[in-house]
Amino acid sequence: MSDPLKMAAETEEIKPVPAAMGEKKDVVLCKKIVETLGGGGDQRVLLVGEAGIGKTRMAQMVDKEASKDVLCYQTLWLHLNRKFKVNDNYIKEKKFEDEWSLYENIASQLSLYSDFEETEVGERDEDEEEEKKVEDLLKDLKPKIEKYLLEKKEAVVKKLEDDKKKKEKEAAEKLEAEKKLVDPAAKKAKDHGNKNPTDAAKEKTTQVVAGGEDKAQTSSERKPYLLLILDDEGMTSEYEVMVHLGLEDFLKDHTPRKILITRRQETEEATKSGEHAEGEANDSQSGEKKEDTDGEDEIRSADKEEPESQARVKTEEKHEKVVPPTIDDLWGSTNTYGEITFQTTNESQDLLESFNLKEAEALFTSSMFFKDMPNFFFDPVPGTDEKLLNHMLKKSKSLPAAINVLAKSLEYTVKSKSYKLNKDEEERLLKEKIEMVLSAERGNPSDQESSSESPKKASGENPILLLAYKLFKTDGPLKDTILDCFWHSLDFFEHCGCVYYRDLITQWILEGYFDPVRSVEKAYQDGHSIFMELIDRGMLKIQENNVVVPEMAMRNVIDPRRGGHLGKSRLGFSRVYGGNKRKGIGKITQLDDMIKTVQAKKGDKITTILVSGDRLRRVTPKKFFKNLKELEVLGLFEPTVKPFVPSFSDQLKLLRVLIIRDCDLLKSIEELKALTKLNTLEVSGASSLSKISEKFFESFPELRSLHLSGLKIESSPPSISGLKELHCLIIKDCPLLQDLPNIQELVNLEVVDVSGASGLRTCFDNADGAKKNKSKNKNFYLLTKLQHLDFSGSQIERLPIFQDSAVAAKLHSLTRLLLRNCSKLRRLPSLKPLSGLQILDLSGTTSLVEMLEVCFEDKLELKTLNLSGTNLSELATTIEDLSSLNELLLRDCINLDAIPNIEKLENLEVIDVSGSAKLAKIEGSFEKMFYLRVVDLSGTQVETPELPADTKIHCLKRFTRADGKCFERDTWREIKEDIERDRSENASSSDAVVISQEITEKKPVEIREVESNAPRASDCTEKVDVNKERLLKVPIDRALYQKALTSLVDSKIPQEEVLEINETNKLDEEALASAEFVSFVDCTPERVKSIFEKAKLVKGCWLRMCFDIKDPFDGVDEENLKSLETLSITNLLSLETISFIAKLENLKNLSLDCCPKIKTIFPEMPASLPVLNLKHCENLEKVVVGVEVSTHTNLDLKVENCPKFGDYVMVDHSDVPPPHEC
């Protein structure tokens, strides 16, 4: 037989093994892989495919099955979802850190430790206290591993030899016994042709193989073997581990070699393209055996992904061993390094086919959720006879990870306190959510360009993974912080790989998800709470030694939030860190209200500290920093001691990351120029900082992330233009800022956010005369990595262009272009190059009068188009090409008179043109828009269009007619019947006219004059309330407006004492600080929060037509609301609850009017609220869950037109319109 070590093998073709009766396909495949690996020679099996198909799950099954093979004496797991720096410099400079990490991980699997580790700190000599060289540690550890593995191998060899001798002896004895029974004469004749008994026994035993069947090689061909599992190859390749880190040479005595490799499909394609990852990994271990979880630990993704669902392996010829193999060689059917040539078998296709409905059912029913599953899972899906459970499992697209994540998310949901407290209602909402998400699945787009540029989007969102995401609850104390942490985790792991769990929580704090941080300990506890929820939901998976990886199948879900992950992160630290542990934060712990570096032994240096101002006040800053000269990462939250910058700037010369957050006392940062090694700098909330010198940033050539916000600077230092390594540039909420640096050649930029710069009038050069740089920020076509661009709230008149006539390349990476409330923006450049846009927000750009036809071309991924409040008189006809569009928002477009044909936009879910007073026509029919949920024509002149003929998405549909009348039903067929019935009866329309006349007669003359100049109401609720939003937008006499406002708020309060607030008006800081009465109109939640951060003496608050607010005081410090006595809320269509209002001891009067979504007002009943007025809240059921309001005898409760309210006897007013007309 030829020596397998010298023979160049071809790819082995394995015939499918027939399944045993009732045996699942994945079990059959597992046995097939073990049989292949256990065959003769060096074997290598590949499992390649997209995230979530069960590659790691199959590897775990193989590990368990291989342990039954007597010839497999050891399995070693190496998780390659981390970065090893193993390039030529690594070898040349003899750096052993990553090699140590690798062998330390192997030793931990074998329960082996170095002598140094086994020695207690107190028992070490002084010489040992000095850091022992990693090279010496390796010399100590490697022999232990070698000895252990050889002993395991020798034990198996000895057992095989003993078994062989035993069988030979038994065969000989059996043969001898048979001889005695044979006739002597016949025996004598037969003996001449027979071998001796021992030889006969040997010949017979060679037919025995492990498992007892002659289906593989004989025992003489099969040898004891070590199984090496390389899981989630990508961040580091097989070749890097085996050759550069020396594992091949280290295992030279353990042949034949058996290797099982799992690899994400897009990682394979990226590696073939030469996208070789460099950088050092974090300190977490990556070689330990993985916990028994479904899905797989997959980290790395490349910018360009393979659109096919299956991976293929090319066959390459054997290369000479003296020539280092290329990247392509690593993925061939043979892989050669050292003296070994592998037979490679690709089982990727069989893996895809091994998980179907039967396996999905088995996996789901084995989950903990199955026993607590609500009964409605066995109800039929509307319109079919199929049970909801079966229908749901079919939607998994054969992804084990999807089943696993959904089962865990459902289990977490039904075991939550809120679910148990109101089980019936929560169960109903859960069922509705499941039916809605499953029914909203779209078909895959057929456009080839879309598929090639973005296969993730082209393949469509997996409805099961999307459902798991939709199950996140954002109504708890931390609100939507869990969403920030979830999206950050996915992004972080793609750039950096696996991470220790404490490091991950610290990353969340650094990114600002728990701001304001008054206590680092409290922020860490909140982070740990979210971390555990993500673990429980299956979104994060924890390996041994608390190393964390995400469920990367969740990358299939597209972030639906307006700003996305990059819009919510302060640093984009993963772009700075990149998996290089020298640029990370190191191993940390939370202790004494600080987060700092773990000190494993005496004298270990501290390189990271995060500390709040409260904790810092306990010490003298200069003394505190004196002993921290090795510090590299420093986070200061709300520091209140001064002057604190000089206390560390002259000592911390090694600082790489500096965060100074929410420091009102900071007036200058010039001393920071001494910190020349900075790669990350944040100075935010420093309201006293008014100037940064022009050359300031010349001191930081390595800066990769810069965050300046909440400052009073008027000019941005031009030296920012020289930061060639910059990835994230955030200069937001600087209202006095008048210019920007020239950033058009900073080709590494991924985030540019200058939102809230209300004084910024141009992004070009604002200098005069000869000094003017006419090319400054003229063209962004070089910023090919840019993903997020936000100019919201600025006063810029024009944008840079995004293309060059000589370059045809597209800026496909840009997913969000946000220009909300850029009120001076007059026109847009061609947006055609921005082919990857998902969200385009131009709302509130009141000067925008024109959009080029090409702006909507090549926008196959655009999900949300918001043109509300613009002055566009027409839309480009190319709008019909936005095939992926889900939301079309054209509210208050007062000059728009027609919308071109949108009939092809069959993925639309929301069409809102409310308040567009001149709009009279929408071309095309809505008949084929089967996913449509909301149509709002109120305040327009549009006739009722042809509504969808069928309904695919299962949820409540809402149609608001031009006259403001609302129709809500489960299907469009029912809504059409209601509309037809309403037309024939003509009753509701006549009632509305009478009511309108009655209300008009009661209004002051001044208000009627104002309304006569305003457009039609933008929502059905505006029939019974003056549209103050329109009052703010119509140019009318100021005195007339003041009189009207007095009637709207409270005639008893002098108008000059009421501070009027909308989304964009400028407010005097001193007036805001002393304001006692505030009136909000059309404000975002962020605007309300920012006001209450400064206004702390408010007694009366009126909120009107703030359409996006779910909780008016979300994120507001309750201490700032202690003085509140009167709260009036009108026309808040999204209002769902009012947080911690029960703690407002001075609240005397609360009014809710036209808030259709709210069902329960308070989490708990206020102790001393005397007056509560409720009007036109059509879904309001309770004031407090589980508490009857009638038991509160001191409460003066008035209820009008709240049909579902059951706590109190309602007041019936004949002159109030029905709830659906409010």
UniProtKB/Swiss-Prot annotation:
Region annotated Disordered, chain positions: 171-225, 263-327
Any single GO molecular-function term of the entry would be: ATP binding
Residues in a coiled coil are: 122-183
Its job: Probable disease resistance protein.
- Biased composition range(s): Basic and acidic residues: 171-205, 212-224, 263-279, 286-322
- Description of its domains: The LRR repeats probably act as specificity determinant of pathogen recognition.
Q: Which UniProt keywords apply?
A: ATP-binding, Coiled coil, Leucine-rich repeat, Nucleotide-binding, Phosphoprotein, Plant defense, Repeat
Q: Which organism is it from?
A: Arabidopsis thaliana (Mouse-ear cress)
Name of protein: Probable disease resistance protein At5g45510
Q: Lineage of the source organism?
A: Eukaryota, Viridiplantae, Streptophyta, Embryophyta, Tracheophyta
Q: Which InterPro entries match?
A: LRR_dom_sf, P-loop_NTPase
Please name the GO terms of the biological process aspect recorded for this protein, alphabetically: defense response
| One annotated Gene Ontology cellular component of this protein | plastid
Sites binding ATP sit at: 49-56
- At which residues are the LRR repeats? 654-676, 677-699, 702-724, 725-747, 785-806, 813-835, 836-856, 861-883, 884-906, 907-929, 931-951
Sites bearing Phosphothreonine, chain numbering: 293
- UniProt similarity note: Belongs to the disease resistance NB-LRR family.
